[in-house]
Amino acid sequence: MKKYLMLFALFAAAGAQAKEFFRVTDLPDGWQAHISVEGCKDNHCGGKGAVFLYHPKQETTNVFKSDDLIFERGEGSKISAAKSPLIMKDFTFDGLKDIAVATGNKGPKNSPTYDIYEQGEYGYFGSNYSLTELTKNYMGMFRIDNKQKALIVTNEVDCCTRIEERYRYSPEYILTLFYSRSVDTSDEDKVVVTETRTDRRGNEKTTTRTYTPAQWKRLNK
């Protein structure tokens, strides 16, 4: 009971200027979250907000603040994890769920950005600068390849060139680029794909292939 009274006090204090309060349902592994946000108009919520994350079996309550906690609300005071401004997955491949908290649309071409927090001992989450920067320098939230233990990011250089890069993550918070691909569609009659692979010794190998638009479309079905 004492734990939940403390949580309520934190929630009330941090959300003193907030106008809307929600509970996030169906987070993984039993995690629970409440969020406060400055305001909502129609179904769109945004502005300054706070996230209160806790687990019934842990003593720690984590509080994350955001300058622009944007998300689409549903009906009532509950929102599903999928529609919330939170993403809980294992970003660092250590078997523990980490969390991404929305911070607005500050990435390239107004793409969404997130603050990333890595789970440590006893349910405590600490800020992860390296992963946060990935969301600011590329377009949107990175994807996870569990088989390769890689983080996948994308970007658009100009109107016709799209970039994909893959990074390995080490426990020392180091990101190592090991694969990049650029797809150039500036010529309507061809697609030029350049791939660079880097092995663990740092040796690079670059290949360039040209496809017709129809061939490229078939390859990416």
Regions found by a protein language model. Give the residues of each.
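Sec-dependent N-terminal signal peptides
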Residues: 4-13
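Beta-propeller blade termini
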Residues: 21-26, 36, 80-91, 136-150
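Acidic, small-residue rich beta-repeat scaffolds with periodic aromatic anchors
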Residues: 17-52, 146-221
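Beta-propeller fold detector
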Residues: 63-67, 126-133, 176-182
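Hydrophobic beta-strand segments that make up the repeating blades of beta-propeller
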Residues: 99-103, 151-154
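Repeat-based blade/solenoid architectures
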Residues: 66-85, 132-142, 161, 189
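Beta-propeller blade repeat segments, especially FG-GAP/WD-type strand-to-loop junctions
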Residues: 54-57, 110-129, 166-171
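Acidic carboxylate motifs that coordinate Ca2+ or other divalent cations, activating on Asp/Glu
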Residues: 94
